[in-house]
């Protein structure tokens, strides 16, 4: 059983946006695919997407688990219940997020999950970031699924009702920024910014892709392109390859930060990542 996993709630009505948020484009991916990929990188466990019954979803990373929200219009507690129930026996804890968080950083996810890893008695690690509680950028014990389901049946649909019945540790801005990686890579806590309106989306699209470091090895390192690391703007492995004039095909492997190996060009990148591209003769 994995220590942690991810849940993305994708079944919201997107009434303020006026269009389904899951499929909105952001730097070559969709909001939902990026969020799923970031959660997969940060947790190492399965990632569950909770959708409305019959909802169309954009293409998602392989091994994504998709479950239907059994009741329409019941809000986030219903999605939390469905997502946690899908992870029963598969993980001890899950980071739960909405679908519309393009700036969510793996360092933020790991910091929040670490609370549950270090304190068995804690049920929920709840960031209170940028002035607001963030129930859809928080970590929950999988064992809370029956409790959340009971609250839905009682029509007590706000996350605050769940928190009233749990041991909750709240993380304010200071506690989050005390983490060295968050301080360096997400100092403004942009991880919790979501995209609710067309204006939000326009602003999010105007932001540049994350700054990442790229380095080539083996045969790929020959010539000017291979002379040491370089910084590029890229939101996916494919974009990082394109920025160096590299074709990311079956002859090339990428290693993220020296450990996570991927051959999937859609793998999302975050600020501060280092992408090592390896050719076959370098062990790729």
Tell me the role of every PLM-derived stretch.
Residues 175-210:
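Glycine-rich phosphate/pyrophosphate-binding loop and the adjoining helix
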Residues 162-165, 197:
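A short, conserved alpha-helix in the catalytic core of glycosyltransferases
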Residues 1-156, 164-189, 279, 283:
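Nucleotide and nucleotide-moiety/phosphate-recognizing core
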Residues 202-283:
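Ubiquitin-like/PB1-type beta-grasp interaction modules and other compact soluble beta-rich domains
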């Amino acid at each position: 059983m994995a220590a942690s996993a991810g849940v993305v709630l994708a079944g919201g009505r997107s009434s303020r946006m006026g269009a389904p948020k899951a499929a909105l484009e952001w730097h070559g991916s969709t909001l939902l695919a990026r969020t799923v990929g970031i959660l997969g990188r940060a947790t190492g466990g399965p990632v569950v997407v909770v959708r409305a019954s019959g909802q169309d979803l954009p293409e998602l990373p392989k091994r994504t688990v998709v479950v239907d929200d059994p009741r329409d219009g019941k809000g986030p507690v219903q999605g939390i219940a469905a997502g946690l129930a899908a992870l029963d026996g598969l993980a001890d804890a899950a980071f739960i997020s909405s679908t519309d968080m393009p700036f969510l950083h793996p360092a933020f996810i790991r910091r929040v999950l670490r609370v549950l890893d270090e304190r068995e008695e804690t049920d929920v690690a709840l960031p209170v970031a940028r002035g607001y509680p963030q129930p859809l950028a928080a970590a929950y014990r999988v064992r809370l699924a029956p409790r959340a389901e009971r609250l839905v049946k009682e029509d007590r649909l706000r996350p605050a009702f769940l928190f009233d019945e749990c041991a909750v540790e709240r993380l304010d801005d200071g506690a989050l920024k005390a983490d060295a990686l968050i301080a360096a890579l997400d100092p403004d806590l942009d991880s919790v910014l979501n995209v609710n309106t067309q204006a939000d989306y326009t602003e999010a699209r105007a932001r540049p892709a994350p700054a990442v470091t790229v380095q080539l090895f083996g045969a790929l390192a020959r010539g000017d392109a291979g002379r040491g690391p370089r910084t590029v703007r890229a939101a996916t492995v494919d974009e990082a390859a394109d920025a160096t004039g590299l074709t990311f095909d079956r002859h090339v492997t990428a290693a993220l930060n020296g450990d996570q190996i991927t051959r999937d060009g859609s793998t999302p990148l975050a600020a501060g990542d280092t992408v090592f591209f390896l050719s076959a003769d370098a062990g790729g």
